Amino acid sequence: MSKNLLIELGLEELPAYVVTPSEKQLGERLATFLTENRLSFEDIQTFSTPRRLAVRVSGLADQQTDLTEDFKGPAKKIALDADGNFSKAAQGFVRGKGLTTDAIEFREVKGEEYVYVTKHEAGKPAKEVLLGVTEVLSAMTFPVSMHWANNSFEYIRPVHTLTVLLNDEALELDFLDIHSGRVSRGHRFLGTETTITSADSYEADLRSQFVIADAKERQEMIVEQIKTLEVEQGVQVDIDEDLLNEVLNLVEFPTAFMGSFEAKYLDVPEEVLVTSMKNHQRYFVVRDQAGHLMPNFVSVRNGNDQAIENVIKGNEKVLVARLEDGEFFWREDQKLQIADLVAKLTNVTFHEKIGSLAEHMDRTRVIAASLAKEANLSAEEVTAVDRAAQIYKFDLLTGMVGEFDELQGIMGEKYALLAGEDAAVATAIREHYLPDAAGGALPETKVGAVLALADKLDTLLSFFSVGLIPSGSNDPYALRRATQGIVRILDHFGWRIPMDKLVDSLYDLSFDSLTYANKADVMNFIRARVDKMMGKAAPKDIREAVLESSTFVVPEMLAAAEALVKASHTENYKPAVESLSRAFNLAEKADASVQVDPSLFENEQENTLFAAIQGLTLAGSAAQQLEQVFALSPVINDFFDNTMVMAEDQALKNNRLAILSDLVSKAKTIAAFNQLNTK
């Protein structure tokens, strides 16, 4: 008869960002534990709040399934001595399995007999197996952990309670310094310690103590309450998904409410107000029906609506202090001169091993000028790039960015416009930080994109040059994100800038502040980001083939990978790749100094292939270019069927290899076809 299992771990307040991943991890680890221990179950449901992680298993078998295993031992000739008795080898084998020689039987495998024993293990009761479930809790991993009291162990937060129930029976076990029971804790202020009656009554028992254990239910409550406020007040609330996920992990019993602030603060840039509310106070932003910011906010209380007016006033007071700061900095920063702030950047360290921000900007300016030419920017855009590169970090020394560092670049754009800078320059100051996340927004202007590329390239080359190279998952300077940004920007704008040649040219530059080094490591790092950008849709062999192409032009490489993936599902892919692969492999033996001499052709197939290669222009999209190369497959096959490439005559051999080398030099601009797998 199946049962339901409940495990709840009661802890001190968890960081909000840890709650959801830990809830998921607990469920996955318990499922693995049960499967490995042969305890079948129907379903697993997880729960979490800031002060607990829990999981309930439904339909858990009351005992393990029986286990029958066959074990192969030594060959019969080794298992028996001269007298036909079991040898020490055979006796040791069965003893290691907990059996006797009576269990031995011989089975023939590939013409020879071997010792076999069959071991039967009866399943243990679930209750007995579950005594080891603390292994699941011990194996949990967290981004941070801590010691408490005089204990030698560490965990994400101090553990206060452990509840393990099999239906309504409490199992006795120990974890860290806690003995399990059926006592859980209610809401910190509204509830008390409570007894969990059974695994099935878990949610109801906690609800009576003002705890909503199901995170999804808490989220639905928050959204429903906000929607009610929208209708009652005739407003729109920005329900930011990330903020919602954070807030639901800050509360155990949510109650949403609306507060207000003086309309005078709306004169401060919207980004400042939104940052103050959303990032610093975890408030939802309120707008009118036209989408304009209103002097209101929505927050979520960890509790019921008792004395809610006092809660609203308290939250309003805290927010006003933030808004006062924003208003002050907005007013005072406008008195500053951009030139003065830029001059002071010589005293701001970019990194102690690399130098100042001013030096970083100087290098970026040189790189930006080179990129502007490569990207064929107009004269006006080139001028804007140069001006932006001279000043683009100035806002880091403003009071606003000092207080709200999330606004770097955003405030730079606003202050630049107020100072009379060209709009393209101001926009580039904001856009040079983009993308600021893996799937974040990209620059929309060419000027901003070039500045972003230049800034990221110098950052990458500078850190690599002083040996600060990411290893494993460790990337404290976000160089992977910066390089992924380089790849995404190049692809987005379709700039066909050969990265290998670009990086070579950057390493030829001379700066007093820094000498670029470790070029090979930089190129491998960029290749790894292009590889990642190709995505899971492209199999490993296709990614490797594209990465080994003769051109390192990001948009073309990504397009080639996509085209190869689509082509791999067609009928002519296998024969085309196989003929090209044969050509690639033979071409490796070609003498690079030998040019094709048509006078040495001995058959029509040589002439036909050479003419086809000469006519191969590889125009159009990556898919069209691939189609043009694949169209040569019959011609290549005819050539191989009628021509001895590795002829005894050295001149003929070299000439035929030269034909293939010409083919490969063109085809390899798409991919190294001999790296593709057709099996």
From Swiss-Prot:
Pfam families: DALR_1, tRNA_synt_2f
Subcellular compartments: Cytoplasm
Reaction catalyzed: tRNA(Gly) + glycine + ATP = glycyl-tRNA(Gly) + AMP + diphosphate
Keyword field contains Protein biosynthesis: yes
Gene Ontology biological process: arginyl-tRNA aminoacylation; glycyl-tRNA aminoacylation
Any one annotated GO CC term: cytosol
Annotated family: Belongs to the class-II aminoacyl-tRNA synthetase family.
Protein name: Glycine--tRNA ligase beta subunit
